[in-house]
Amino acid sequence: MTNRLLLRVSLSALPMLILFREAQAADPAFCRQYAKAALNQVRGGLSDPACAGGLQGSRWSTDFSVHYEWCLGISDAAAGGERDARTRYLRGCTGR
């Protein structure tokens, strides 16, 4: 009996978890703009010898789909935080 109750509770919570996940995911149009802006930042960093050496990891990928697909799975706020991290790095290495 308790196994059935546990199963019912688990199944009834599933739609709420799905809705919560969808509420956090970013909009595809937002993610296209995010990925374009990320690539502009990456290109800017690669073109500056003072910055290029520190461009490591997926944050600095030259592949549009890496940025776009990542963005689709996170909130707008998380995408903004990633953009801001790239901006801070670029300002630091260029001195601007």
Residue ranges and their predicted role:
Residues 2, 15-16:
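Extracytoplasmic/lumenal soluble domains of exported proteins with redox or metal-associated functions
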Residues 16-22:
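C-terminal segment of classical bacterial N-terminal signal peptides
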Residues 1-10:
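Bacterial N-terminal signal peptides that target proteins for export
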Residues 8, 15, 82:
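Functionally constrained cores in energy, signaling, and assembly domains
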Residues 25-96:
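Post-signal/leader-peptide non-cytosolic segments of secretory proteins
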Residues 11-13, 62:
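Compositionally biased regions
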Residues 10-11, 22:
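Intrinsic disorder/low-complexity segments in short proteins, especially the signal peptide
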